[in-house]
């Protein structure tokens, strides 16, 4: 029996996963409308005429909230597999997860005390 006999499905899946996006991108390039008029190059503003430029400055507080959100969102992504396999992992994994959560709580308290979560 051939050694890689169990991997044909994986190889087929990888080929399909490579071909589908390539075909979709090729089809959209072939079917797109051609023309380079000024009307096509302007931004679409829900049927209204665009007013002003697109370069506006955002308050830095938005970025701070976004960074804090990303940190705790990644925490959820790391804790979800642990929560699914909680009963099989044992006490050591529970202690490691508690240490991980404690580090994130310390980071949250630090951000709170530094004023990163204050809007004023």
UniProtKB/Swiss-Prot annotation:
Enzyme Commission identifier(s): 7.1.1.-
GO cellular component: NADH dehydrogenase complex; plasma membrane-derived thylakoid membrane
GO BP term, example: photosynthesis, light reaction
Transmembrane spans: 1-21, 64-84, 89-109
Catalytic activity from the UniProt record: a plastoquinone + NADH + (n+1) H(+)(in) = a plastoquinol + NAD(+) + n H(+)(out); a plastoquinone + NADPH + (n+1) H(+)(in) = a plastoquinol + NADP(+) + n H(+)(out)
Assigned keywords, A-Z: Membrane, NAD, NADP, Plastoquinone, Quinone, Thylakoid, Translocase, Transmembrane, Transmembrane helix, Transport
Protein localization: Cellular thylakoid membrane
Subunit structure: NDH-1 can be composed of about 15 different subunits; different subcomplexes with different compositions have been identified which probably have different functions.
Protein's job: NDH-1 shuttles electrons from an unknown electron donor, via FMN and iron-sulfur (Fe-S) centers, to quinones in the respiratory and/or the photosynthetic chain. The immediate electron acceptor for the enzyme in this species is believed to be plastoquinone. Couples the redox reaction to proton translocation, and thus conserves the redox energy in a proton gradient. Cyanobacterial NDH-1 also plays a role in inorganic carbon-concentration.
Family statement: Belongs to the complex I subunit 3 family.
Name of this chain's protein: NAD(P)H-quinone oxidoreductase subunit 3
Gene from which this protein is expressed: ndhC
């Amino acid at each position: 029996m051939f050694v890689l006999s169990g991997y044909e499905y994986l190889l087929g899946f990888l080929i399909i996963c490579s071909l589908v996006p390539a075909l979709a991108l090729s089809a959209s390039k072939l079917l797109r409308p051609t023309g380079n008029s000024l009307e096509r190059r302007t931004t679409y503003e829900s049927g209204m005429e665009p007013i002003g430029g697109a370069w506006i400055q955002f308050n830095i507080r938005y970025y701070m909230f976004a960074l804090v959100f990303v940190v705790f969102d990644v925490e959820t992504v790391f804790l979800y597999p642990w929560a699914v396999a909680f009963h099989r992992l044992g006490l050591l994994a529970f202690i490691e997860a508690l240490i991980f959560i404690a580090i994130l709580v310390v980071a949250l308290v630090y951000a709170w005390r530094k004023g990163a979560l204050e809007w004023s």
